[in-house]
Design a protein with these regions (language model features):
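Polyanion-binding catalytic cores of nucleic-acid enzymes and NTP/SAM-utilizing transferases
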Residues: 126
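Feature for mature exported/ectodomain regions
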Residues: 1-75, 80-123, 161-166
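Hydrophobic residues in beta-strands and at strand termini
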Residues: 94-96, 135, 144
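Short, surface-exposed loop motifs enriched in S/T, G, D/E and P with embedded aromatic residues
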Residues: 129-137
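Extracellular adhesion/glycan-binding regions together with long Ser/Thr-
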Residues: 71-78, 137, 142-146
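C-terminal beta-strand-rich structural cap/linker in extracellular carbohydrate-active enzymes
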Residues: 139-166
């Protein structure tokens, strides 16, 4: 995985996110999901991914197939909900110039969901879940169910990865 990009590159790879929630019969529970810029949190997640072989394997890296993974885009999200239904549909979207360069339209994308947990001593650890997104019109779209989002909690980071052969 590449080292921390320069400021110019960081501006190029800057992502923006959005979220849409729909429920049964169009009923939307009281949910507010916002994309946020959290550089420190994203840095911690990237450190985890670069140093954890099991996590890389879960994301698609394989010694046998000689494949590695490359992080293409990250986006932190914050969710406030009082009544998210388990069956509700939550669509998270990540937009970045990198996506158009890295993926074909309609390509399936492995997305790691990094969920922070603060221990009693103040240290933060992350639990990772793997979901699949899809590239639609140059954006990565991840469709989740309400029960998944509730599991992730109020604060999480989506990390899109690309498997690279060779």
């Amino acid at each position: 995985l590449a080292a921390t990009p320069s400021k110019t590159v960081a501006d190029e790879v800057k992502a923006s996110g959005s979220a849409t929630v729909t429920g049964v019969l169009g009923i939307v529970s009281d949910v507010k999901v916002t994309a946020k810029e959290d550089t420190a949190q994203v840095e911690e997640v990237l450190q985890d991914i670069t140093s954890d072989a099991d996590l890389q394997k879960a994301a698609g890296a394989s010694k046998e197939k000689k494949t590695t993974i490359d992080v293409t885009v990250t986006q932190a999200f914050e969710m406030q909900t009082s009544n998210l239904l388990d069956a509700a549909n939550v669509k998270l979207t990540i937009e970045s110039k990198v996506i158009e360069a890295a993926y074909e339209d309609n390509e399936q994308v492995t997305v790691l969901v990094a969920v922070p947990k603060t221990k009693a001593d103040g240290t933060v650890t992350y639990t990772y879940y793997t979901v699949t997104g899809k590239v639609v019109d140059g954006e990565i779209v991840v469709n989740l169910k309400g029960r998944q989002v509730k599991l992730y909690g109020s604060n999480f980071v989506l990390v899109a990865v690309k498997t690279i052969e060779g």
